């Protein structure tokens, strides 16, 4: 294992009956990074987290933690803690008692417990809430207590299984920022599970996109969004226009009946490929100036932009623009070479 990896999954396979949940999955997780396992329901992300935590056992493969194989180590002996969507707080205990619970089990001195609990309350911005009943707290406050209870034990890794799922949108966005702040302040590894693309893009150092028990792509939020590895990733991470094309040469691609300059290279000449264009990368221009031309068939106001649908003879293009367009009007679309992303064509993802 490389020195900067804290966890390494090697060829993890897991099945329930005839259903393969994880298919020979391998993954390296670095020290001090915020890594997100992202994918739709049933993709295997939560099972991966549970195998790391020790709540599930892999059928085959190894879980390596700091150079030691931990497949047979029970959860309570692993140097990591888990926060679930259902926070599992003790309703008969107040905030202080919930956070102190694990420390009391370890029979730590009272003054040490008091110091550590106060440090956690400050970290999660709940100073002054020590004596509050759990049921008197909001969902966001309860979640902070759950995070403090997990972190007070000083784990080397914190596992978070869709912990924001029960919160409303405003609270969720606030907690995204809070979680990232806490992770950066503590400098420990966070492994976060979600199906929410915005959450993953907002918080992560590294995103692992999963589907059908396999890793589709792993990289920074910028790489995942701007350079999707395949059509599944392109469709799952934000909205995309995806069309068939032909790579004529390095930096030269043909699609939608015309030739465009692009920034991709390394494909075979005349190789069949797929072209990805993000809706926000289209520029709306006069009809006669357009690289692509069509008729506006739909305009939906989304708050920060209009979602505009433009149809030509063979394609329907979706673009996001702050300018309004009239339904039935003919407009042109312009593209920079950097906005045209090329993917290898796959028959089935």
Curated annotation (Swiss-Prot):
EC number of the protein: 7.6.2.11
Name of protein: Spermidine/putrescine import ATP-binding protein PotA
Keyword ATP-binding: yes
Annotated keywords: ATP-binding, Cell membrane, Membrane, Nucleotide-binding, Translocase, Transport
Assembly and binders: The complex is composed of two ATP-binding proteins (PotA), two transmembrane proteins (PotB and PotC) and a solute-binding protein (PotD).
The encoding gene: potA
Single GO cellular component term: ATP-binding cassette (ABC) transporter complex
Species assigned in the record: Clostridium perfringens (strain 13 / Type A)
Domain of life, source organism: Bacteria
Keyword Cell membrane belongs to the record: yes
Main location as per UniProt: membrane
Membrane topology: Peripheral membrane protein
Gene Ontology terms, MF aspect: ABC-type putrescine transporter activity; ATP binding; ATP hydrolysis activity
Job of this protein: Part of the ABC transporter complex PotABCD involved in spermidine/putrescine import. Responsible for energy coupling to the transport system.
Catalysed reaction equations from the record: ATP + H2O + polyamine-[polyamine-binding protein]Side 1 = ADP + phosphate + polyamineSide 2 + [polyamine-binding protein]Side 1
């Amino acid at each position: 294992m490389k020195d900067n990896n804290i966890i390494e999954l090697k060829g993890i396979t897991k099945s329930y009956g005839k259903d393969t949940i994880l298919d020979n999955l391998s993954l390296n997780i670095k020290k001090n990074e915020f890594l997100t396992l992202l994918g739709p329901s049933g993709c295997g992300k939560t099972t991966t987290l549970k195998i790391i935590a020790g709540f599930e056992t892999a059928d085959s493969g190894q879980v390596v933690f700091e150079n030691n194989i931990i497949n047979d180590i029970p959860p309570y002996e692993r140097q990591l803690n888990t926060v679930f969507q259902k926070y599992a707080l003790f309703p008969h205990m107040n905030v202080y008692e919930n956070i102190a619970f694990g420390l009391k089990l370890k029979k730590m001195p009272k003054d040490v417990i008091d110091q550590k609990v106060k440090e956690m309350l400050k970290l999660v911005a709940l100073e002054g809430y020590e004596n509050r009943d759990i049921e008197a707290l909001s969902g966001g406050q309860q979640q902070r207590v759950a995070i403090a209870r997990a972190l007070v034990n000083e784990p080397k890794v914190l596992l978070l299984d869709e912990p924001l799922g029960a919160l409303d949108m405003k609270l969720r966005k606030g907690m995204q920022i809070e979680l990232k702040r806490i992770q950066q302040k503590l400098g420990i590894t966070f492994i976060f599970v979600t199906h929410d693309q915005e959450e993953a893009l907002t918080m992560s150092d590294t995103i692992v996109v999963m589907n059908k028990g396999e890793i589709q792509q792993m990289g920074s939020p910028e790489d995942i969004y701007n350079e999707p590895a395949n059509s599944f990733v392109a469709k799952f991470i934000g909205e995309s226009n995806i069309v068939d094309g032909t790579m004529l040469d390095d930096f030269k691609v043909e699609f939608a009946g015309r030739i465009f300059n692009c920034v991709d290279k390394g494909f075979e000449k005349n190789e069949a490929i797929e072209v990805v264009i993000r809706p926000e990368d289209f520029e709306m221009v006069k009809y006669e100036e357009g690289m692509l031309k069509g008729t506006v068939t739909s305009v939906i106001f989304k708050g920060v932009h209009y979602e505009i649908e433009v149809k030509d003879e063979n394609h329907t293009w979706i673009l996001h623009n702050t300018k309004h367009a009239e339904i039935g009007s003919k407009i042109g679309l312009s593209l920079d070479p950097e906005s045209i992303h090329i993917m290898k064509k796959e028959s089935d993802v």
